[in-house]
């Protein structure tokens, strides 16, 4: 949570590049980057398919069903607007031609950083914050995209929560 908070406060661009398996709480932290980029065959989710299958069906063997439902592939995630770009890999995967993949990653970094050159620090900060807030509220998750304009940040009042908890106990 602290790494997400720290990243969200930055007024410089940040890039997250997922090259293999981005999972667990670290996946959430990566989502707080200005741009999230994935290799074509990488996967990205807040839980592993095995973990999801165990929770939903109490059977880790149903991991293929879970993986399909989770939409954790680069292709699925770009359609859901969770990630910003897919970096192509050679047929058979990145390990088949490491130099080509490294060149593709280099070009992606350069291209994405170029987008921020004309932005003020405040614009970079606001773009990152709004992008993060849209996750789960964009196409594929909600029906009315017009509601996105009404997103508001509201600070929790922990004193009121503590008082309420005392009443319940």
Task: Explain the meaning of each model-derived region.
Residues 99-169:
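Intrinsically disordered, low-complexity segments enriched in small/flexible residues
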Residues 1-110, 114, 118:
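Conserved catalytic cores of soluble enzyme domains
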